[in-house]
């Protein structure tokens, strides 16, 4: 968790509530993603870092630059959000604002991102079966990402939010070794 999470939360919540009220959650998610990309561009990121916590002529020029780059890609409401963040010296929270907005959106839509780590790519049948089982257990729609980790001998590790299910062969062997040493 970033140092900016607590600062970003009210902005993310207000953005989420507004987007939900306008029935534009996906549009706002996309626009905030664009804003993050712009804000994390090296030149702009350096300027944001130097303008953190203050509202100066330099920060106004920075806002104008961000708005110019985002022009046509974000709506007037997101432009207003950029201005409010700048006025409060909070442009540095853009990434955390986006992450929190995404979490609120996923919670509202009952979606959970799941990372499945294995030693090799799962087959489509395995993905389908695992997705169905996880959706039943978690009572949410699963958005699965597969990660290949050559250090796993076999099995899989599933991460869904704060929950980790470690079904890797490495962990099973370590448990067995621990049980044998305990005897």
UniProtKB/Swiss-Prot annotation:
It holds the Pfam family OSCP. It is found in: Cell inner membrane. The keyword Ion transport applies. Coiled coil: none annotated. PANTHER family: ATP SYNTHASE DELTA CHAIN. It comes from the Bacteria. Disulfide bonds: none annotated. This is ATP synthase subunit delta 2. F-type ATPases have 2 components, F(1) - the catalytic core - and F(0) - the membrane proton channel. F(1) has five subunits: alpha(3), beta(3), gamma(1), delta(1), epsilon(1). F(0) has three main subunits: a(1), b(2) and c(10-14). The alpha and beta chains form an alternating ring which encloses part of the gamma chain. F(1) is attached to F(0) by a central stalk formed by the gamma and epsilon chains, while a peripheral stalk is formed by the delta and b chains. It comes from Vibrio atlanticus (strain LGP32) (Vibrio splendidus (strain Mel32)). Keywords: ATP synthesis, Cell inner membrane, Cell membrane, CF(1), Hydrogen ion transport, Ion transport, Membrane, Transport. GO terms for molecular function: proton-transporting ATP synthase activity, rotational mechanism. InterPro entries: ATP_synth_OSCP/delta_N_sf (IPR026015), ATPase_OSCP/d_CS (IPR020781), ATPase_OSCP/dsu (IPR000711).
């Amino acid at each position: 968790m970033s140092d900016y999470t607590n600062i970003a939360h009210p902005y993310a919540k207000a953005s989420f509530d507004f987007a939900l009220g306008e029935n534009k959650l996906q549009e706002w998610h996309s626009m905030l993603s664009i804003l993050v990309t712009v804000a994390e561009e090296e030149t702009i990121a350096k300027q944001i870092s130097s303008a953190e916590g203050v509202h100066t002529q330099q920060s106004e020029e920075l806002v104008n630059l961000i708005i110019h780059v985002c022009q046509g890609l974000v709506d007037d409401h997101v432009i207003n959000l950029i201005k409010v963040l700048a006025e409060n010296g909070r442009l540095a929270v853009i990434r955390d604002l986006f992450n929190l907005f995404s979490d609120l959106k996923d919670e509202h839509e009952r979606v959970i991102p799941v990372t499945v780590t294995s030693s090799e790519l799962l087959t489509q049948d395995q993905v389908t079966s695992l997705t169905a089982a996880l959706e039943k257990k978690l009572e949410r729609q699963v958005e699965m990402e597969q990660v290949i980790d050559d250090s796993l001998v076999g099995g899989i590790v599933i991460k869904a939010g704060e929950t980790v299910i470690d079904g890797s062969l490495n962990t099973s062997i370590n448990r067995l070794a621990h049980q044998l040493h305990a005897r």
